[in-house]
Amino acid sequence: MKKIVVTILAVICIAAVCGGFYYVTQKDKNSEEVILTEVQKVNTKNIDTDYPETPREVVKLFNRMIMCYYKEEYTQSELATLTEQARKLMDDELLKQNTKENYLAAVKADVAEYKELNKTVSQSSVGDSNSVQYIKDKEDELAYVNASYFIKTGNEFSRTYEKFVLRKNDEGQWKILDFYQVEGDSSEDEE
């Protein structure tokens, strides 16, 4: 009697293992792996609930968007969503200067000019955490972050440097207040 019970339990265990293996292998065959483009990854990022914590991270995300503008393929709808995502990183003061329509039109015009001149932004980098400068100006907390961009024009490369000014808002989020071109030092750059 004992042998029969052990044999039945062994058969049940083997059947369960085989059934589990079959289920797992069939599940993988049936599920299609969806590969998102960089534009789709940025556009589906929930910035409202997963906002970057540091000024450097804000600029890194903004740079991902810049790389999408100048380097990736996208539809006009995806570009509109991308510019909306970028505006979520901007301070209210900068948003007033860049309405939704104006910012989208400016990006379209700049991208068209780059294409006409056979220019692309081939790489971007942000200064390391130690190079971020924090300043208190009256009630405002400001941060200055350096970034650089490799620009490819035909077969030639050049490097452009920008300084981003970010301000901490009432929710504790760092928002881009301004950015402008500066003379730079490549030794401060880090991906």
Describe each region flagged by the PLM.
Residues 1-43, 191:
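Amphipathic, hydrophobic N-terminal targeting peptides for secretion and organelle import
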Residues 16-21, 42-43, 96-103, 118-124, ...:
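Short low-complexity stretches enriched in small and charged residues
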Residues 28-37, 157-191:
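Short beta-strand edge/turn micro-motifs at domain boundaries
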Residues 40-118:
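Core segments of small alpha/beta cavity-forming domains
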Residues 44, 142-154, 159-165:
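Extracytosolic low-complexity repeat regions of secreted or lipid-anchored proteins
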Residues 83, 88-90, 102-106, 129, ...:
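Noncatalytic linker/hinge segments flanking ATPase motor cores
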Residues 105-153:
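Surface-exposed, charged secondary-structure patches
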